[in-house]
Amino acid sequence: AIWSSTLPNGMRIKGIEYGELPLVNFSIELNQGMLLDAPGKVGVAYLTAQMLNEGTVSKTPEQLEEAIGQLGASIRVACSRESMTLSGLCLKKNFARAMELVEEMLLHPRWDEQSFAVVKERAIDNVRQRATEPEAIAQSVFDKALYGAGSVLSENPSGTEASLQSITLDDLKAFYDECFSPKVARMSFVGGFTQSEVEKSLASTGNWPAKDVRQPEIGEDGAEPAGKVLFVDYPGARQSYVLIGSKAMPMRSPEAYPAVIVNDKLGASSGSLLFEILR
């Protein structure tokens, strides 16, 4: 059975009742990602997501990791350009306790200065590593050519070394206060529970108060950059990366999803026509 509902605080839920395996797969996605980062502060959303993995008010990072492990579960928060997603997998018998940990992570983050310093330094190391990878360099050049160097869309969600250096823990707290709300959250669920059982297990999320939050504003100038060919010289690279593309329609367009399907068939996956021809 496939079902959907909305909790009193505004969080939307979609579920698929599937009892073939004793597992539950779930995710909570918020429409709050890198697009809400302020100019010069790209990386705030990314670091906020990372900090939600670093313990809660009542649990250190080690204690949280141990609590998740004791349930035979996995729960992680990640950030993309457009959204922040908590995803998880657990045994059916442990679903209620897993949801208690999810509530702790989302509603009671630890905001520990020492953990923040570690997370920030790790992010800076990742940025430095990307700067040595031909594929990452090619993607960065491509995005700036397509969207314009001044557009937030041309940035990587994890930011730059300069932007990360400028970010403080207070920036993360402000982002959390201004952008987190069940009104912009969607939960997806697949497992051997009925709709009423899932809603009962989520009753405690009523502690997450609904509020209006900032929404990303991306201009639609419709301007398409003139066609061009760009080369990036990277001596010693063992492979060449070729990126070809242009701007597409907004995702709210009725043509967007059919275009995604066609794109996947033509060349976006290992089962695509392009992959089969080249391989």
Regions found by a protein language model. Name each.
Residues W3-P8, L230-D233:
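Short acidic-hydrophobic surface loop/beta-edge motif
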Residues A149, P157, S181-P250:
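An aromatic/glycine/proline-enriched structural segment found at the starts
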Residues E104-E113, T205-V213:
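A common structural junction motif
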Residues A1-S5, K144-A185, P216-G222, A259:
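Histidine-acidic residue clusters that define the catalytic metal-binding segment
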Residues A203-N207, I261, R279:
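Short, solvent-exposed amphipathic alpha-helical segments in soluble enzyme
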Residues L266-S270, R279:
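Hydrophobic alpha-helix feature that most strongly marks membrane-spanning transmembrane helices
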Residues K14-I16, E20-N53, K59-L107, K120, ...:
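M16 family metallopeptidases and their MPP-like homologs
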